[in-house]
Amino acid sequence: MKSLSDKVEHIVVLVLENRSFDCILGNLYPGNPRFDGLSGTESNPLHGGDPVRAWKNNARDPASMSIPTPDPGELFDDINMQLFGLGGRPGAQAPAMNGFVDNYVRQTGDDGAAFRPEAVMHSFNPEQVPVISALARQFAVIDRWFASAKPAATGGSTSTIFRRRWR
């Protein structure tokens, strides 16, 4: 009898820049305790304001499909704040993942206006991303995969993925 790993013929790694697992697939299997998706209770603090809750809509118009616009910050300082919060630093403790909203509102658009805090907490319904949802339902989804790299911008994160030794 073949083991499960003997049955695997191909591994496909899909990397989506500037979108989190929760944003794209977090609503794929609602209420399934075996899937580490969104529960509907997630939020992120906003310094000096109320916590900003995760949210979704059902619209399929161009504006809804491009939330957040612009993309969240992707430089080292941005990622560090997103993971460890305001003034947080990498260390022995696990990242609190509590700085996404604070980091997003500190960015400004070309017109100098601050970004809307709720935009970075948006997620899609499976119907809004039908192709990737269908692929995820037909194949395995790894919902608890974490890179062992320090916070890095896109280039560093991508090179970590492709440098990985697959066995």
Label every model-predicted segment.
Residues 1-167:
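N-terminal pro-sequences and low-complexity stem/linker regions of secreted or lumenal proteins
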